[in-house]
Amino acid sequence: MKKLFLFIAALSMSEIAMAQYCSIDGFTTPELRLASYQRSQAATSFNISCDTGYSILFNSQNLVSSNGISYVSNGPNKLRTKLNLSGANSGLWGVRVNQGASQRQKYIVSVQLEENPFNGVPAGTYRDRISVDINF
């Protein structure tokens, strides 16, 4: 009976010790750079592998709406952009979405400059920050 008890204790401890994991890899580029003309585009992609279900949230520092309307800014000046998502996500920005376990689920993030930068906007460096938050 003592041996059986030790075996059960060891078995239950091994289940506790199994860690869940998620990893991100395969970034095509860490930075999205738009050219200085209307409708210019940039994109990146990456893969997520999780051995358990996870939730994912795509966000932008300057996000205006969940359909991806955002802007780049140099402080006082703004240029409107459109952010797009493809992958297992619903395509919504600023909305946490639950996903099932997967191996190498590919996500693509793209941005398009919606406004003409030559229409009265001063030259400068215009920025936005995109973040991806994963909970598992």
Set out the residue ranges of the language-model regions.
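Absolute protein N-terminus
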Residues: 1-3, 19-20
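Sec-dependent N-terminal signal peptides
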Residues: 3-13
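Short, flexible beta-strand-to-coil junctions
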Residues: 12, 61-64, 75-76, 86
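N-terminal small/polar-rich segments of proteins
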Residues: 18-73, 96-136
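Mid-chain, well-packed structural core segment of small domains
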Residues: 77-103, 107
